[in-house]
Amino acid sequence: MTFVVTDNCIKCKYTDCVEVCPVDCFYEGPNFLVIHPDECIDCALCEPECPAQAIFSEDEVPENMQEFIELNSELAEVWPNITEKKDALPDAEEWDGVAGKLQHLER
């Protein structure tokens, strides 16, 4: 099993989760983070660290966000690895909690 970054990370990109990951399985796009499913060891350290509550265990991803399972896998293959915490995006607080942000995902 793996953990999955979902919709609410888009346009927020808090990186608190990256800092606690023991296997460095996070990958960074312009306005979103993903978890590489083959590298995640299912330790669950990242989930409570996410201020946006955007990380779920794969078997607990909400029904309306199932597409993020495949999206994490796909984008982790092309985006660079991130291993250190960075500042969140400048307007993260404004976007935190906004529903339906997939259309704003920058690849």
Swiss-Prot record:
Keyword set includes DNA-binding: no
Classification via Pfam families: DUF3470 (PF11953), Fer4 (PF00037)
Keywords: 3Fe-4S, 4Fe-4S, Electron transport, Iron, Iron-sulfur, Metal-binding, Repeat, Transport
Protein's UniProt keywords contain Repeat: yes
Gene coding for it: fdxA
Entry protein name: Ferredoxin 1
Cofactor note: Binds 1 [4Fe-4S] cluster.
Molecular-function annotations in GO: 3 iron, 4 sulfur cluster binding; 4 iron, 4 sulfur cluster binding; electron transfer activity; metal ion binding
InterPro entries (alphabetical): 4Fe4S_Fe-S-bd, 4Fe4S_Fe_S_CS, 7Fe_ferredoxin, Fd_C, FdxA, RnfB_subfamily
Residues noted as binding [3Fe-4S] cluster in the record, renumbered to the chain: C9, C17, C50
Binding-site list for [4Fe-4S] cluster: C21, C40, C43, C46
Main function: Ferredoxins are iron-sulfur proteins that transfer electrons in a wide variety of metabolic reactions.
4Fe-4S ferredoxin-type domain segment(s): 2-30, 31-60
Cofactors named for this entry: [4Fe-4S] cluster; [3Fe-4S] cluster
